[in-house]
């Protein structure tokens, strides 16, 4: 049985049992659609069996590449955008301590990121920073022509060639790309870069359990075996457990779709642990790209409490009643702090003396759950015993499966993203890319230029 638990105690006032049961029936039908591969986008269901079907040999090859990176590099620059980097970053930042010592810095490779936006200042400073550092690059792109990572990789490759010489960089660049085709694959073959394969049947936002996510995670010093073990446990549970028997993914999908039908059109991912910052970013891409189409979809947002209680808390409590929350709870911190008594008690906090800081955080969480429920915001709770590779593997696979089920319940293809092309086509036209001349004329005319 998985470590993950779900409670709907603060949802029940909004979603009656008969409505929930109907949604659970729909969720079970969607689960069967995922498992039998009969739904829209079924050519991208390779992620479903990844944890159980990934070979030990494949994990070993990834670990060997990670060890090579660790042997000669202080930094690994992960070049990718969207699902090509968010899964890895979610796991790495969830597991990396906020404050490192000189000793821990020597033991691990620091992960940097590029190609996830087009800001000139960021990339200029990154290149300047790397001038006198030992570094490697993991470039991740199925095609090799996605604009943001392609630009970043061109800049980094130029620096690598100047710094080490073209003939000496074949063990400093690792390409995660298509098995046999595409610009990046051809470039990797030309330079003899080591390559890892992005499976044809796995889309970017579902790729964290492929080399896309696993190589950076391993290079950062974390156990990809434990991550996959957690995912494998969740895979087994979600595939073998029917909705009526307590399938966690069906329960989550049923609740969010039931609330959506009642006008709750925005779901807020809430965490009380700053380390979940990029888990929430990964979650937003997963659900936003999977469900936001055909005029449908729950809008995914995120907040970090208690910090955002002092910014977004007012809106959540008293604003438009279109919100639902999913709160990620962690039962046990890795370390804790005890509050002590002070003689003069001039800050009025002696009533907390002897309590752990985690107790204060848990009380803030419970108090907020009650307040938001009373204010008209249904709150679902997802609980993990702790933050480690295994529990993160469970959580991420749970969300992937839930997203597929929820998308099918919504009646959309959870595995395409046609709307993403619109901005690209306009950008290409404005930049003068060949073949976009007519669109450029249309854009300039629309803007009032002749």
From Swiss-Prot:
Please classify the protein's predominant subcellular localization into one broad category: cytoplasm
Coiled-coil region list: none
Q: Name one GO biological process term.
A: glucose 6-phosphate metabolic process
Q: Which InterPro entries match?
A: G6P_Isomerase (IPR001672), Phosphoglucose_isomerase_CS (IPR018189), SIS_dom_sf (IPR046348), SIS_PGI_1 (IPR035476), SIS_PGI_2 (IPR035482)
E.C. numbers: 5.3.1.9
Which keywords appear in this protein's UniProt record, sorted alphabetically?
Cytoplasm, Gluconeogenesis, Glycolysis, Isomerase
Pathway the protein contributes to: Carbohydrate biosynthesis; gluconeogenesis; Carbohydrate degradation; glycolysis; D-glyceraldehyde 3-phosphate and glycerone phosphate from D-glucose: step 2/4
Task: Report the active site residues.
Answer: 289 (proton donor), 310, 424
The EC class name is: isomerase
Extract one GO molecular function annotation from the record: monosaccharide binding
The reactions it catalyses are: alpha-D-glucose 6-phosphate = beta-D-fructose 6-phosphate
| Cellular component aspect of the GO annotation | cytosol
Query: Any idea where this protein resides?
Result: Cytoplasm
Q: What does this protein do?
A: Catalyzes the reversible isomerization of glucose-6-phosphate to fructose-6-phosphate.
Enumerate the PANTHER family for this protein.
GLUCOSE-6-PHOSPHATE ISOMERASE
Q: Which family does it belong to?
A: Belongs to the GPI family.
Protein name stated in the entry: Glucose-6-phosphate isomerase
Q: What is the lineage of its organism?
A: Bacteria, Pseudomonadati, Spirochaetota, Spirochaetia, Leptospirales
Name of the gene this protein is made from: pgi
